[in-house]
Amino acid sequence: MIVSGLPASGKSTLARALAEELGLPLLDKDEILESLYDSLGVGDHDWRRRLSRAGDDVLFRLAARTRGAVLDNWWHHETAPARLRELGGRLVEVFCDCDPALAAERFQARTRHPGHLDRRQSPEQVAERVAVIRATFPGPLRLGGPLLAVDTNDRVDPATVTRRLAPLLAAPVLPG
């Protein structure tokens, strides 16, 4: 299961809850990345970018060795779909969507590892960055499998999402 959406759209919160509801392991790119920061240190934006790419590689390696998992990441639309399809099996996408202003508000309010470099930006810069990302954001990854869009503007009930996912998860995997 692939959880996608804008930064601060509620991906990690929903992914954790779905993994628990479904009894699946959670592979969270931020957890991997923060572990790399702890081991290798916090640096500038170029360092962050390098560790982020390494974190992506670790995430995909773990996913390739895991039969059934919830994957949480800020996916790159240029590269992620092909890499995800290479994993094989059923790719069910859960797309988290929320208002860009709310995403900017959440982004500014959240506390993350210092390696993410979030606090180096003013609230205005964060709002502008999220608005630019949203304006150019292509939406769901559209991996060719089932897609469930979830409005994450308000609190989401994981049990309700799990019920909506049940028929998507139960459908047979078609070759090809």
Language-model regions: role of each:
Residues 13-65:
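Conserved substrate/cofactor phosphate-moiety recognition/catalytic segment
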Residues 100-107, 158:
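Switch/connector loops and helix/strand junctions flanking conserved nucleotide-binding motifs
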Residues 6:
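P-loop (Walker A) phosphate-binding loop of NTP-binding proteins
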Residues 166-176:
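C-terminal accessory "lid"/substrate-recognition subdomains
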Residues 112-161:
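Small-molecule kinase domains that catalyze NTP-dependent phosphoryl transfer to phosphate-bearing small molecules
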